[in-house]
Amino acid sequence: MSKKIVLLPGDGIGPEIVAEAKKVLEAVDAKFKLGLKFEEDLIGGCAIDVHGVPLAQSTLDRCKAADAVLMGSVGGPKWDALDSNIRPEKGLLKIRYEMGLYANLRPAILYPQLADASSLKPEIVSGLDILIVRELTGGIYFGEPRGIRLLDNGERQGYNTYVYAEHEIERIGRTAFEMAMKRDKKVCSVDKANVLEATVLWREVIQSISKDYPEVELSHMYVDNAAMQLVRAPKQFDVVVTGNMFGDILSDTAAMLTGSIGMLPSASLNQDSKGLYEPVHGSAPDIAGQGVANPLATILSAAMMLRYSLNEAAAADAIEAAVGAVLDDGLRSADIFSEGMKKVSTQEMGDAVAAKI
């Protein structure tokens, strides 16, 4: 039975890195007989140029009908002056919301071959393997009312609403505990329950879920302390679960512990484990078309796609092992290059990973 994957290369370096991920997926498809079928469509700035909107309804329908979606990146200075309602990034927010992608999985793994790339001492980060589980469709980014209003005294006031319903906390919490069961069985829930009522409820719901997972050790941490601990002693964490805004900030902090954002994949899943997979890094318009972008985050996102949406763990393992083997061989893209290594292009890196499979 075939599995349909929609590719959304997007803007900037997106088309280059998605092309390499597709190449690697074709290699595992040939080896494991997965029956992968690919369709390609537009999102972001390139969709605005063609359709006048960052995500056409036809594209959204195609994504909803697929088994999984693999995206490159969206945005660039060309579209920065547009009204905020039709900016490239709105296409990504819409696809997350319309597909019900409430769980964002952000691994922060330090490859031993790249230990020197981290800004922290090797003894602090070596062996780092954190999974941040971020709630993606609720919280202050989606809460209503929101806006900018004119007060009676003539002053303008900006306002947003931080809101979470029990069911939203429940489902992201269960996702985190399920992930922890497959890892080191530790969950740290991050909130600001000493100040925000919405996160008082968050803490209560997470605590009650933990009763269903007695093997998993649960801890709670205020977000300011969590940010400090991520830098001070990151290896204390296994799975971190948190709301939309806190997760947005903490996952980028965790990303830089690894030394290169060009290595980090992500997954966004819905109730049915259908998902959108994308690298953590942006569209990098300054290097687009030069063949120097690191495709490994997108390739590793493809591995996550095989694992979480297509239930093809062996194929996912094969991709991750191939990435490790290529790094062992000393091949490096520009962003992770160091003295004594061999600098390779985007395409050469993709070729090397595919060849290892």
Swiss-Prot record:
Its main location: cytoplasm. It is found in: Cytoplasm. Mg(2+) binds at D224, D248, D252. The record marks Y141, K192 as: Important for catalysis. InterPro entries: IsoCit/isopropylmalate_DH_CS, IsoPropMal-DH-like_dom, Isopropylmalate_DH. Pathway: Amino-acid biosynthesis; L-leucine biosynthesis; L-leucine from 3-methyl-2-oxobutanoate: step 3/4. Its EC number is 1.1.1.85. It comes from the Bacteria. Binds 1 Mg(2+) or Mn(2+) ion per subunit. SMART domains: Iso_dh (SM01329). Belongs to the isocitrate and isopropylmalate dehydrogenases family. LeuB type 1 subfamily. Homodimer. This is 3-isopropylmalate dehydrogenase. It comes from Saccharophagus degradans (strain 2-40 / ATCC 43961 / DSM 17024). The lineage of its organism: Bacteria, Pseudomonadati, Pseudomonadota, Gammaproteobacteria, Cellvibrionales.
